[in-house]
A protein has these predicted regions:
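Non-catalytic cap/lid and distal C-terminal segments of serine-dependent acyl enzymes
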Residues: 1-260
Length: 260
């Protein structure tokens, strides 16, 4: 028997006055959302094109299988029902929006405005439209590559909105590793649970950068195994397929079992 397709709700051309851009938003709803009158935790993920549908992915056919993975884990009772909000990038403005500072060679630097869009425009809309648990303990933010970079930047500079951050294969290299300085000067330390990972086949520099990020977080007061999870994935590449392969582990860390 063919498995039922995940339940997705679409909000085409969602407009941001802050960024002066429109983008598609896709919302995953857990099984029984329509009949179980309860509220749900929410995970916001960047690069929404790559999450749910292979035909929309940046590399055709390569997507994270977010809906299928969630359905499998929820139905099996391994995690509670949760919602996911996929936020499309805008293509040519992706670097602008996913970077915290302007790099002398590559430009960028609108990550703060992108964070405002998420917090002041998108999240209030989602909380009005769906049955969410809106507090930080039930609200997570995540992404990969530059999406991982901007996730950490937003979480550190706009505390009290997101309680957990998923930072996959982060672009620590951006603007001479400026994110490390942000970590070191963030005081007081926000109440955040942080996942950081890197694949061993993403390059020696990327792996070294991830280890520097872990060290900076530990130095700033996070504790590995408590509110910081750090993982290196043997043979993991910088690709949608690699992130899809460990997305189930991310969900288990976020929602399954002890909160570590």
């Amino acid at each position: 028997m063919t498995a039922k397709a995940p339940t997705l709700r679409r909000h085409p051309r969602f407009r941001s006055a802050i960024l002066d851009h429109a983008r598609d938003i896709v919302v995953y709803l857990p099984p029984r959302y329509g009949t179980a009158r309860k509220s749900y935790p929410v995970l916001y993920l960047h690069d929404g094109q790559n999450l749910f549908e292979p035909e929309r992915a940046h590399v055709p056919g390569q997507h994270w299988r977010v809906g299928e993975t969630l359905d499998e884990l929820i139905v099996a009772g391994r995690i509670p029902p949760v919602m996911v909000v996929g936020i499309d990038n805008t293509g040519t403005s992706r670097i602008q929006e996913y970077t915290p500072t302007s790099d002398a060679r590559l430009g960028g630097g609108r990550g703060g405005d992108y964070g405002r869009f998420l917090i002041e425009e998108l999240k209030p809309f989602i909380d009005r439209t769906y049955r969410t648990e809106p507090g930080p303990a039930s609200t997570a933010l995540g992404g990969s590559s530059l999406g991982g970079l901007v996730t950490l930047h937003i979480g550190l500079t706009r505390p009290g909105v997101f309680g957990s951050l998923v930072v996959m294969s982060p672009s620590v290299w951006w603007d001479r590793r400026v994110i490390l300085s942000t970590v070191r000067r963030t005081r007081p330390r926000p109440a955040l649970r942080i996942w950081v990972d890197m694949g061993t086949a993403e390059g020696r520099r990327a792996l070294d950068d991830a280890r520097l990020l872990k060290a900076a977080l530990v130095g700033a007061g996070w504790t590995a195994g408590r509110d910081l999870h750090y993982a290196e994935y043997e043979g993991g590449t910088h690709s949608e397929a690699a992130w899809a392969a460990r997305f189930g582990a991310v969900l288990a860390w976020l929602y399954g079992g002890p909160r570590v």
